[in-house]
């Protein structure tokens, strides 16, 4: 398996040439990222088949794919689902039930982290989708800045400083005093306010759950803004990405980066909150100038974000081949061990994690064993709080926190508007101020 990905890369070129000749693919896979392309390359080489990967951007994924799944017209053989809508999709008649003959994936259950396997089940306990990943989060930080300002870059020591919200504020003050900013924007603190009292957005009585911990996000975000603890570089903006490489202009917002900006207007970001996949798809892709100057540690509370589940379409004409693909991706020990070595992806598949965790290291993190850290964080994940409303209600909440922080509304007005927006989107949900 050591050379398998290299061989597959050559095979993918050959497969591409074959695809150009108009030959119909043996299998069609639809996803929202290109992370499966390397998997497909290996699968094509192993089984001498062609696989067509269709990528739909995340923001359009559900609205584009759902009509095909419901009508059957143009539906893929295999498709992925993200955690934010997974709870909805496992209850729909889209994915084939995998906990039945001839698949019997229920026999795999003990090989996985409990929460990962459980999330792929519907309310009747049928397995509809499976995953190879676990996605706990942490705080990635710059080692050189940590040494300069805090006197150490040791992840355990920095984790102690980050272990409470008050500790985060203290470090933020020290960073600002040295012309650094703790985070790019206030979004990096939300996982830790939510984590103080983890609750589902909607409970079993169909009531919106607004906890004191969630309300505290308004206050912490406003304090971070007022005290200038962040660089005001919104998540996913050009300035946000650039902040991982070095100094950026303070309060750049969504504007493009200009090379001739004055140094006197600049600051440098110390850290950012990201889940496991953020290391590979964000930092390694965009922090090329600071590679090797990073480490990862805990925040005030554990959290997780994202994750990809995969299953086959219930009416696929290629179910045998589709299952072989799924089995290789999530339950082939040799493949997954090689996958970890090639990508650093943190697995939920225990036979491989037990093998690799002891001596794992990542050059980008100056040799840190982030694998062991994330596996320990994964043990703290409480997936019972996940609901099918998380993405939409979370977005509405974030919008109103932003309006308050920017001075567009009072806190009370923002909360009231949030309740109104939830009620408009989901009339059946009872909101706290409902009479």
List the predicted regions and their residue ranges:
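Helix-loop-helix "hinge/cap" segment bordering the ligand-binding cleft or interdomain interface
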Residues: 102-105, 121-189, 200-235, 314-320, ...
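Short, polar/charged alpha-helical segment
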Residues: 32-52, 397
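Periplasmic-binding protein-like
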Residues: 290-311
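Extracytoplasmic "Venus flytrap"/periplasmic binding protein-like
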Residues: 46-112, 126, 148-150, 261-271
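Extracytoplasmic ligand-binding clamshell segments of periplasmic binding protein
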Residues: 63-64, 187, 199-286, 291-293, ...
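C-terminal motif of bacterial Sec signal peptides marking the signal peptidase cleavage site
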Residues: 18-19
């Amino acid at each position: 398996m050591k050379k398998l990905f290299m061989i597959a890369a050559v095979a993918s070129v050959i497969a591409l040439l074959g695809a150009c000749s108009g030959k119909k693919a043996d299998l069609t896979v639809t996803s929202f990222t290109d992370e499966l392309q390397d998997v497909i390359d290996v699968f094509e080489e192993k089984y001498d088949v062609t696989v067509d990967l269709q990528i739909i951007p995340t923001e359009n994924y559900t609205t584009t794919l759902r009509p095909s799944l419901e009508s059957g017209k143009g539906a893929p053989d295999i498709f992925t689902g993200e955690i934010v809508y997974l709870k909805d999709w496992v209850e729909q008649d889209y994915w084939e039930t995998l906990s039945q003959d001839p698949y019997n994936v229920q026999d795999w259950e003990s090989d996985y982290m409990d929460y990962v396997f459980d999330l792929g089940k519907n309310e009747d306990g049928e397995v509809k989708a499976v995953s190879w990943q676990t996605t706990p989060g942490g705080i990635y930080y710059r080692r050189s800045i940590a040494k300069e300002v805090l006197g150490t870059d040791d992840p355990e020591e920095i984790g102690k400083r980050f272990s409470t919200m008050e500790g985060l504020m203290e470090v933020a003050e020290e960073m600002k005093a040295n012309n650094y900013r703790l985070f790019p924007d206030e979004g990096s603190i939300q996982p830790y306010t939510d984590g103080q009292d983890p609750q589902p957005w909607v409970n079993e009585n169909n009531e919106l759950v607004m906890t004191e911990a969630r309300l505290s996000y308004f206050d912490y975000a406003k304090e971070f803004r007022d005290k200038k603890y962040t660089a005001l570089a919104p998540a996913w903006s050009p300035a946000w990405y650039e902040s991982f490489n070095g100094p950026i202009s303070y309060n750049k917002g969504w504007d493009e980066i200009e090379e001739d900006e004055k140094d006197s207007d600049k600051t440098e970001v110390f850290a950012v909150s990201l889940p496991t996949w953020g290391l590979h798809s964000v930092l390694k892709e965009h922090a090329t100038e600071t590679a090797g100057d990073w480490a990862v540690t805990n925040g005030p509370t554990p959290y997780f974000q994202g994750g990809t589940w995969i299953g086959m379409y219930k009416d696929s004409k290629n179910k045998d081949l589709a299952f072989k693909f799924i089995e290789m991706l999530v339950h082939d020990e040799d493949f997954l061990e090689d996958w970890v070595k090639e990508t650093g992806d943190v697995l939920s598949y225990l036979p491989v994690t037990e093998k690799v965790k002891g001596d794992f290291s990542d050059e980008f993190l100056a040799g840190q064993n982030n694998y062991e850290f994330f596996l320990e964080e994964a043990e703290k994940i409480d997936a019972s709080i996940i609901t099918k409303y998380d993405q939409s209600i979370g977005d509405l909440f974030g919008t109103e926190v932003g309006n308050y922080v920017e001075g567009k509304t009072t806190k009370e007005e923002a909360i009231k508007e949030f309740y109104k927006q939830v009620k408009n989107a989901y009339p059946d949900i009872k909101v706290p101020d409902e009479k």
